[in-house]
């Protein structure tokens, strides 16, 4: 489907020169003089090469048709990450470069959204929040009230984050998958 360059957003998949690219950043620039342009940074899906393109905001760009499906994470091996479609029981392997920074948050049997182009995975979307256990942090300080200061902690997936002073080792906490920030103590 052809669209104007100014309508391209992060996460869109563009087809250019017979290759697919996932958009990492898209910014519309309106200089004081001259023609407005769309600055688009994207990654080629086939080999992970990043490129940056400038289009006039009125230029036509081919946006690829993408289908989103729910998949269950099964396991990781040397070849990549393996997921199963809950409806059809089809299994698909996703390369490590597509999973990227989402890898530490994947848990067995977690339901994620995979974006597919011609049944080839091009992007992954995790749930917004995930529950993890604190495996390393400073000891709890008695008498310290809840304050806005956080102490460093390491979670069971190896991610470092800040937690409130009352959180101890072994406590299960909810964190945002986007940036690893603490949300709350788990209610389970």
Curated annotation (Swiss-Prot):
Listed SUPFAM superfamilies: Nucleic acid-binding proteins, Translation proteins SH3-like domain
Domain of life: Bacteria
One annotated Gene Ontology cellular component of this protein: cytoplasm
GO BP term, pick one: peptide biosynthetic process
Family annotation (SMART domains): EFP, Elong-fact-P_C
Pathway entry: Protein biosynthesis; polypeptide chain elongation
Major subcellular site: cytoplasm
Any one GO MF annotation of this record: translation elongation factor activity
Places the protein is found: Cytoplasm
Record keywords, A-Z: Cytoplasm, Elongation factor, Protein biosynthesis
PROSITE patterns in the cross-refs: EFP
Transmembrane segments: none
Pfam families: EFP, EFP_N, Elong-fact-P_C
HAMAP family: EF_P (MF_00141)
Function noted in UniProt: Involved in peptide bond synthesis. Stimulates efficient translation and peptide-bond synthesis on native or reconstituted 70S ribosomes in vitro. Probably functions indirectly by altering the affinity of the ribosome for aminoacyl-tRNA, thus increasing their reactivity as acceptors for peptidyl transferase.
Record-stated family: Belongs to the elongation factor P family.
Protein name: Elongation factor P
Species of the source: Nitrobacter winogradskyi (strain ATCC 25391 / DSM 10237 / CIP 104748 / NCIMB 11846 / Nb-255)
Lineage: Bacteria, Pseudomonadati, Pseudomonadota, Alphaproteobacteria, Hyphomicrobiales
């Amino acid at each position: 489907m052809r669209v104007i360059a100014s309508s391209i957003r992060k996460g869109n998949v563009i087809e250019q020169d017979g290759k697919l690219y996932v958009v990492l950043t898209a910014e519309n620039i309106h200089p004081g003089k001259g023609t407005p342009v769309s600055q688009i940074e994207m990654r080629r899906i086939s080999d992970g090469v990043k490129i940056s393109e400038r289009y006039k905001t009125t230029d036509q760009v081919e946006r690829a048709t993408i289908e989103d499906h729910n998949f269950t994470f099964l396991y990781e091996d040397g070849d990549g990450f393996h997921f199963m479609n809950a409806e059809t029981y089809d299994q698909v392997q996703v390369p490590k470069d597509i999973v990227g920074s989402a890898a530490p948050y994947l848990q067995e049997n977690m339901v994620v959204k995979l974006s597919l182009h011609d049944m080839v995975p091009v992007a992954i979307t995790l749930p917004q929040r995930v529950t993890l256990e604190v495996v390393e942090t400073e000891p709890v300080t008695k008498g310290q009230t809840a304050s806005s200061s956080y102490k460093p902690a390491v979670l069971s997936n190896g991610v470092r984050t800040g937690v409130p002073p009352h959180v101890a080792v072994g406590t299960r906490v909810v964190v945002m998958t986007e940036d690893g920030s603490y949300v709350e103590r788990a209610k389970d």
